[in-house]
Each structure stands twice: as C-alpha cells, then as structure tokens.
Amino acid sequence: MTYSLLPHIHSPQDLHALSLDKLPVLCDEIRNKIIESLSLTGGHLASNLGGVELTVALHYVFSSPDDQFIFDVGHQSYVHKLLTGRNTEAFSNIRHDNGLSGFTTPQESNHDIFFSGHAGNALSLALGLAKGSSNSSSHILPILGDAAFSCGLTLEALNNIPADLSKFIIVLNDNQMSISENVGNIPQGISHWMYPQKISKLSQKIHSWIQNLPSFLHKKKTLSHKVDIALKSLSHPLFEQFGLHYVGPIDGHNVKKLVQALQMIKDQPQPILFHVCTVKGNGLAEAERDPIRYHGVKAHFQNTSLKKTSGNVELQTPISFPQHAGNILCRLGKKYPQLQVVTPAMSLGSCLEDFRKQFPDRFTDVGIAEGHAVTFSAGIARSGTPVCCSIYSTFLHRAMDNVFHDVCMQELPVIFAIDRAGLAFHDGRSHHGIYDLGFLCSMPNMVICQPRNALVLERLFFSSLLWKSPCAIRYPNIPANEKASNSFFPFSPILPGEAEILCQGDDLLLIALGHMCNTALTVKEHLLDYGISTTVVDPIFIKPLDRKLLQSLLTHHSKVIILEEHSIHGGLGSEFLLFLNQHNIKADVLSLGVPDMFIPHGNPETILNLIGLTSDHITQRILSHFKFSTPIPIERFFKA
C-alpha cells in the first residue's frame, strides 16, 4: 500500500491540518500499517483494528497532551502511538528490542499519561486527574471497553462521578468483546440497559433472522452491527441515572460522524458517556470472523495458517506449561466429577477451553474480576467441592486481600493455578509474574510450589487435591521440557515440602526454582570446567521448604546459590535466608533473581542478559562472589 498521509503525521497538530474528507483515507493507511507491522512482530491486533476511526476522531477533535486520554488496559493504543510521533522504526519493532511498548508508557511520550496493562483502572485515574487538575481548559477522556464494566473498580469510580464535572468524557468502546466473548450480567447488560424489554425482544428476533440468512452473504456481521446501533438509539440508557449525559450510540467506524458528534459534546458542562459501537478486528476479514483468535497474534501470522490455538499459544510441540496445565485439569475433571475451575477472563490464555467444552457446568469465567474469582472459589471450597482458580501471576496482585481473608484465613483448600509465573518478556513491566511470592509467602496456611517440568507439574496438580489446604502451583508460559504421562495417577503423591536432588557435588549447593533448574544444570557443567563440583537441588516447594533435606545438605555445604526467576525481594531467596536464621545455620549465600527494578519489554535473550540470569552471567557471578582461585577453566588450561 502507498502511504500518502500517515508519513506526514508526526503529532496531533499535523492531524488537525487535514480536512475531514481525508480522514477515511488516513484510517485505511493506519489500519494497513498495523496489519503490516504486526505481521512481523506479533501483538494485539483485533482490538487496535476495531479502534482506528475512534482514536483518529478523538485526536482530531481534542488536543493531546493538553487534553488527556487515559486508555483502559492500553493494549489498544497502537493508533494513538502512530498519531503522536511514534510512526518510526520503533513502531515496526513494537514489543521487541528497541521497539515501542505494547501499552501506554510515559517514558515513550508525554501523550501517554499513565503506564497501563491491567484493566478497569482508567475511570478512577481520570477522576483523580480531574480532581487534582489546575488546568480548567483541559479535557479528560478515559477510554474504556465494555468489558471494563465487569471490573469492580470501574463501578466504584462510576459511583463517584460528580454531576457537575465538566470537560470529562467517558468514551465507551462497545465491541461486545473482552479477549474472548464478554461474560457476566454487566457487559452483556450494557446493551439491555440501553433499551427496554420490547426493543430487546425485537433485537433478538432480527438477529436470529440475520443469522439464518444464507452463508454466502458475508455482510451478516455488518448488518447486525447496524441493527444494534439503530435499536440502541431508541432507548433511554441507565447511565443517565449516574449523573452522566448519555450520547450515542455512534457508529465507531464512521470517522466523520464520530468527529461531528465529539465536536458537539466537547464543551458540555456535565460529565458525558460517549457510547461508540465498533467491530473488533474491523478491516481484516479473518479477524472480524474470529476476533478471539486474532486478539493477539504471533509474528508472521499472515504468512502461515493459524493452527488451532488455546489463547495465543499454537498447539504444536514443544507444549507449554499452560497447555500441560489445561490438559491435566481435563484429566482431573474426569477423575473428580465435582471439580470446578474458575478463571477471571483468561480461559483462552490459560488453555482452559477444552475443560470448558468438556465440563461446561463445572467451568466459570467471571470476567475481569480477580477478587471475585478468588472469593467465589473460596465459597465453592467451603461447600466441600474441589476447586481450581486459574489466574495469571500479575493479575493475582489485584486479589491479595481476597486470598488472605477469604481463602487462607478460612483454611479453605483452593488450588491456585498461577499462570505466567516468571518474566513476560514482550508484554513488559505490567505483565511480569515476578512479585506474587512476596505476598503469598506471608500468608499463613498457604502451600506454594513450582515444577521444573511437565511431569512434576502433573504430580503437583494431582497431589494438591489431597493436601486439603490452600495452595499455589506456579508455572511460566514457556515450553515444558518433558511430556506429561497422560495417565490418571501413575505416581505416589508429593507431600508439601519434598525437594529433590538433581545431582551431587562437593563444592557448591545450587538451589534452583522451577524451570531455572535447566539453567542450574547448565551452570553446573560450566563450573566443572573450573574444577568446581556442584549439588543441584530442585526445592519444588517455596513454602514449606524441605527443612530436613536442607539441614542435611548444609552440614557439608557452606557455599549456597539460590536461583529464581522472581524478584530477589520476597521470593525463594528470602525464604531460604529466613530458614537459615531460624535454625542458626551459617552459610555464604548468593541469591540470584530479578533485581529491584521494573523490567522493560524485549526479547528473552535481551532481558535475561540485562538482569544477569543467563548461564554465563550466573557462572561468572558465582566465581566472583566465592572468589574461586582457578583463573581460567581447567579444560582450556590443558588445551593451551
């Protein structure tokens, strides 16, 4: 495609110079640029394609950064980045080394007001900005998807909007989707809030008629979209009851109408709910047909046929930890006919779709409501029913009090399947799963473990149902290096606090958590080149530790290395040092993990080099810390 307009847009001021008639052409160029770039890098595709016209219209009518846009989640901000001076090589490398973040990032641009990555906070942040702002001429525009209204935080903020708040426009991008289809009464109810029961029944009849049209009529989705807009325009929305002046619904893919509507409401003296209807994936036929698969794509998605996926993970070897976890839960579902699985909007990412299809009555997606997911799971456990709450590490932060008050304090046997435990690499600072141990370890009654491979993962899941205590099974989103057994229960259960010695040596004790055992075994080989032999231990459990085994090993090991892909504060290293202190054991301990900093996005090798967790870095840090006298590897010495 030839780009005639986009290369000349270096700021919103350049956009303002265009005539209204040129905006549809610019939108086409932006949409093509996103598809072109993400075909090389991967990233969040469907949500950005659906928001092109809306974002262009917002920047055309308002003047960022004086007028402030706050994107909820922020993964749909690619168009915003292109319009605010970031249509550079960095955009072409988005989410990779030397590329832009996939979320709004103030370090990139003063047009990004907040770091983003988690859902539901935009309205609260925007209200705070409005409260503290000394610039009475500035507009504040939180931009939310309809799924954000399943977040309690959004509803709390909605309950606190002053009726006399001016130049405050809530932009509701209603595409009836989250990552997957919306769940729960509120997002689905947005449409029902908009119009009364008679219109709702009419809508259902019309949509049913549209779906029964011949399959060769490819415009069915477009027709449904227009019907929604027409019917919603007949209604009186519930948002008026919150003191908001409702405007909409507006066709989110008609940039001229969007501009005209925004210009009309720009200086209204009360807070406004601006309701826009969009189609997720708009402009790319396959993304429109399947917005769930195209929510997030891998690089070269246009050049290879997309295989059947669970989330963004292609079902091909080697199988990842989340895929193994999903398969294991299906087998557990067959073995334990009461087992319930709960997730907060992560059914696809955490590979739970097979469980949902096999056991629909025993699967609950609560939407973007992590606190409810945890407390709901506690209620299930209290009834005597086994339950697994599957949740990303980074999103578990949002439910810390629920874990404390509703699970651990009640001593309820909820199994937490903590996905994405470790570095998130391309998704960056908001998504790294490297902080959860800091609060989980402080929770009484909590058992915490992490497998090094699929076989241990399998044993932990099967064993956890026998522990009868709250437990957390952590695992990263990386390939697991061994296949699970695929049988029901071929092993004796693991008891909490059972560690495993992987190899024995005389000079060092290296304790490595989870998948870092692979790195530890490589480091062990490197150290052999220096004549240093190492005992490598997989603790399996962070809490409780295998005290008996550790006390035995520490009788003849005084030099200890702790290796984990977690913050050095509050993780395995902290638990081990506490263990030494409690037992009055003296040892020289080198604790290696993620340093006390926010880790940026980037390729795995780059990030691991940055934080010193490659096998070469670790080897050199061990040699330096313990001041081993051999200056060069023995192997190289004899070769010389």
From Swiss-Prot:
CDD domains according to UniProt: TPP_DXS, TPP_PYR_DXS_TK_like
Cofactor requirement: Mg(2+); thiamine diphosphate
Matches recorded under InterPro entries: Dxylulose-5-P_synthase, THDP-binding, Transketo_C/PFOR_II, Transketolase-like_Pyr-bd, Transketolase_C, Transketolase_CS
Cofactor note: Binds 1 Mg(2+) ion per subunit. Binds 1 thiamine pyrophosphate per subunit.
Pathway where this protein functions: Metabolic intermediate biosynthesis; 1-deoxy-D-xylulose 5-phosphate biosynthesis; 1-deoxy-D-xylulose 5-phosphate from D-glyceraldehyde 3-phosphate and pyruvate: step 1/1
GO BP: 1-deoxy-D-xylulose 5-phosphate biosynthetic process; isopentenyl diphosphate biosynthetic process, methylerythritol 4-phosphate pathway; terpenoid biosynthetic process; thiamine biosynthetic process
UniProt: thiamine diphosphate binding residues: 75, 117-119, 147-148, 175, 370
EC code(s) of this entry: 2.2.1.7
Keywords linked to the UniProt accession: Isoprene biosynthesis, Magnesium, Metal-binding, Thiamine biosynthesis, Thiamine pyrophosphate, Transferase
Pfam families (UniProt xref): DXP_synthase_N (PF13292), Transket_pyr (PF02779), Transketolase_C (PF02780)
Cited Gene3D superfamilies: 3.40.50.920, 3.40.50.970
Residues involved in Mg(2+) binding: 146, 175
GO cellular component: cytosol
Catalytic activity: D-glyceraldehyde 3-phosphate + pyruvate + H(+) = 1-deoxy-D-xylulose 5-phosphate + CO2
GO molecular function: 1-deoxy-D-xylulose-5-phosphate synthase activity; magnesium ion binding; thiamine pyrophosphate binding
Subunit note: Homodimer.
PANTHER family documented for this protein: 1-D-DEOXYXYLULOSE 5-PHOSPHATE SYNTHASE-RELATED, 1-DEOXY-D-XYLULOSE-5-PHOSPHATE SYNTHASE, CHLOROPLASTIC
Listed NCBIfam families: dxs (TIGR00204), PRK05444.2-2 (NF003933)
Record-stated family: Belongs to the transketolase family. DXPS subfamily.
Function noted in UniProt: Catalyzes the acyloin condensation reaction between C atoms 2 and 3 of pyruvate and glyceraldehyde 3-phosphate to yield 1-deoxy-D-xylulose-5-phosphate (DXP).
Protein name, per record: 1-deoxy-D-xylulose-5-phosphate synthase
Native source organism of the sequence: Chlamydia trachomatis serovar D (strain ATCC VR-885 / DSM 19411 / UW-3/Cx)
